[in-house]
């Protein structure tokens, strides 16, 4: 501190340091503000520049603000100048690698510094860069730290990120590697600042150098995810995510956010991403070939960041991940082996970074896989929000799948390329749409992101993309067992994705595209379902059609799935419990429905093929949606999808019916799957597929209460079917709010079970009951396997059990229902039995909801609406899909049970009516009883009041009448009537009241008396007061004073004064003086006492002033002299006579 402070003090930077410190505080505040979980869709980019202007006036502002704004807008050019301006790191390309790494480290150090203010420490390891960057870097840090996420990110991160974008390999590496390293290292290092910085330095260098492409993706995602986490979540959580260092993370989270955001160049990147968003799809494709995964990821992330400015935070995580994932999936699909290799390097390099930057589940997970899994686990556990990190241990286990997946990858590579094209098309398009959707869904993801399911979601998305990545990423997974572990971590969530990706990869490279289209798109589809449903129904159809075509394609992939089935089976090997993957089974349901929807598309063949493929394709299919559900996002999205799909169903015109059916069927399957996934959290947790899905949901539920949010989102989204048009936004809002609510209410243990109960009820609605018998044990066993996640999500596990049962039994049913008709039957069974199970699931729900009356009521109505949704979805989805009576039967049972069940079967619904009825009863009773009581009490009070004056009769009569009437108006009327009657009858009582008032009147009299006494005091003797109280006191005092005034002008005051002296000397009785006064003006001395009143009266009228004087004289002949003398005459008492006479004569003369 001292050295740097001295150096800076000697040089210009010391103000910068001060400014930076100030900015540090501001940055902390800003970071917290940005942590707005509400999801500042108003881009931090937009917001922070204002803060920058305020905070960073001066070097930082000029450098950083222009840099941040420019770099945000121009990003690459601006960022480079920013680096130059900030740290002279203008060399973004290779120089950035060294310089930005140092610079980022320095930034981290500076961020750390503002927080720690450990210039020496930071300087120690960062000093060399700092020396160069130090003055400027102070600004970068100030900027960086100050803008916290936006500006510093923009200048430094934007520079670095611009480097990421412009020199995406190195800059990303540097910006990223540093950001992740710094973020990863620095967050931890931030805890250990000194250690941190050197660590980040050394760390960054390898990472930046080693990870160049991937670190970009990972750090980018890391930063963004963390940033999102940080922004959306408290910096502490973000850092918890980042570092898992909850303690240090608080401050570092900001810094990390700053570092991440900055490293991510979030705002800049976001803005750049805005521009790049436009570019990024192209860049995506170019980058895809480019395999600048980081670039693509950056671009995509930027693209998504574009949206991110809107949903920047959530979108950051999602978008970063999404584009990263999508780009990564495209790039990774194209380059994945390389990137996978890079990813392993990343894993190796990112090990640290991942360990530290564990928040980025994608990268962190790979790192985790490498060595950091434990650390990641710690971090993840610490940053439990990042479930993926938690999952990495699982991932460490699941690597098998990923390892197996590489075979898939080998097989899938062509498929991946195909999927690549598709993914690039669908992923890129979908990514774009997804990005678009992401913004809205990212908003939803904001909630999720808040919960960090988004990370999982994003990771799932990444995994979705990674399924492509997983396809290629199986190589990546091979290399990135970390990422495969991430995928396992993701497998927690991404297991699904990876299974989805794997299954997807297996069956759906096409189907993965379906899954990507669906998974990637469903996130987009879900998201796009939001958007797509709204805007992209065709795309959703495309996704669904894609799904349909992929269904065929899935059949073709089924051949691939033959291989992929091996991979799938291998994946199920991992997902062995769910080899019939619960998800797979729901997929059969979904696929059944989808297959039914895609019936024309070789529905039976597809289903059979999918099911034959171990229903892996179907699981893939279903996993896509279920992954969607499994994904935090997807959980919400399935809900959204439900609503959106229902929306689609509502918007059947919007979506072609095939799409509608597909989307609706998918929506049903997805919502249902989502429900099972949500409910199947435990279930999914149970098996890798389930684990994939549920771990993310369930883990989400545990650490994040995201499962609750997810379930809540699902249930709420389902619940929100009523607001289906609003659903995208409501889900987004609801997703956010509800997830926060879920966090708020969902965090409450009761809430998760309730929502999970709802979810489980709904998943139960799907296959819950069908699955219930056998899968319970299976589901429980897998759940036990998933027990690590399960403990926190025990409620979810219960729901998961049902959902597992649902999924497992559905798998059985799906397996049994290999054929389309059989699928229909399971579909039909699903609605029917799940309805009963819904009832079962909802008794707990009812109880829980009863505990949670309002939330429960919401859930119940939502459940009802969801049932209606399911009805509608099942009807529309199944009817077209099944096209057979079963769908109608399903429809009929669903309507009766959803209608009836929501009320009858849905005990929650029954509870709701009952609750509502009790409320109504309470309200009615309360209204009636309170009204009666209130009326009586009021009437009684009124009566009591009136009774006291009015008498007992009024009370009795009033009470009797009031009791008979029991109504205020009548009671009041009676009271009034009785009151008047009582008053008329007992006016004496009223008089008594008056008497009591008389008491107060006596007080008034006392007041008057006091006033009179006051006046009397000036007036003079009490004797005269008795005689002349009223007239004299009132008239004489005022008139006398006035007369005296007139006399003063009229006559010499000196005389009055001399009179005062004389008066005092002569001091005679006032009475005499008054009489004499009156006599003098009036002339009648004989009337002295008796005529005191007469004298004033008589002379008063005749002698205008004299009477006034005489009047004044009578009361105060002194008052006349009393103007000056009166008070004194009172003292003198007598002496008024001569003086008064003298005064009077003089006054008379004067007046005359």
From Swiss-Prot:
Location of the protein in the cell: Cytoplasm, Cytoskeleton; Cytoplasm, Cytoskeleton, Microtubule organizing center
How is it modified post-translationally? Phosphorylated at serine residues in K-X-G-S motifs by MAP/microtubule affinity-regulating kinase (MARK1 or MARK2), causing detachment from microtubules, and their disassembly. Phosphorylation on Ser-787 negatively regulates MAP4 activity to promote microtubule assembly.
Q: Which residues carry this modification: Phosphoserine?
A: 5, 14, 60, 99, 253, 280, 358, 384, 440, 507, 510, 580, 624, 636, 643, 696, 713, 723, 787, 797, 825, 827, 853, 928, 941, 1000, 1073, 1145, 1151
Which residue ranges have biased composition labelled Basic and acidic residues? 53-67, 371-384, 644-653, 769-786, 839-848
Q: Where is this cross-link: Glycyl lysine isopeptide (Lys-Gly) (interchain with G-Cter in SUMO1)?
A: 269
The sequence repeats extend over 248-261, 262-275, 276-289, 290-303, 304-317, 318-331, 332-345, 346-351, 408-421, 422-433, 434-447, 448-461, 462-475, 476-489, 490-503, 504-517, 532-545
GO MF annotations, alphabetized: microtubule binding; microtubule stabilizing activity; RNA binding; structural molecule activity
Ranges: Tau/MAP repeats: 923-953, 992-1022, 1023-1053, 1054-1085
Q: Per the record, where are the segments of Polar residues compositional bias? A: 68-81, 654-666, 680-689, 704-725, 911-929, 1142-1152
* Record flagged with keyword Acetylation: yes
Where is the region 17 X 14 AA tandem repeats?
A: 248-545
User: Chief subcellular site?
Assistant: cytoplasm
Q: Which residues carry this modification: Phosphothreonine?
A: 282, 354, 380, 442, 521, 526, 571, 585, 687, 942
**Where does the record place the modification N-acetylalanine?**
2
Q: Where are the 26 residues repeats?
A: 352-377, 378-403
Which region ranges are annotated with the description Disordered?
Answer: 50-100, 362-401, 641-991, 1074-1152
Q: Do you know which InterPro entries this protein is assigned to?
A: MAP2/MAP4/Tau (IPR027324), MAP_tubulin-bd_rpt (IPR001084)
Q: Keyword check for Cytoplasm, yes or no.
A: yes
Question: Where exactly is the Glycyl lysine isopeptide (Lys-Gly) (interchain with G-Cter in SUMO2) cross-link placed along the chain?
Answer: 838
Q: What's the effect of swapping residue 787 to E?
A: No change in microtubule binding; reduced microtubule polymerization activity
What does the record note on quaternary structure? Interacts with SEPTIN2; this interaction impedes tubulin-binding. Interacts with TRAF3IP1. Interacts with KNSTRN.
Q: What does this protein do?
A: Non-neuronal microtubule-associated protein. Promotes microtubule assembly.
* Protein name (record): Microtubule-associated protein 4
Q: Which species does this protein come from?
A: Homo sapiens
Underlying gene: MAP4
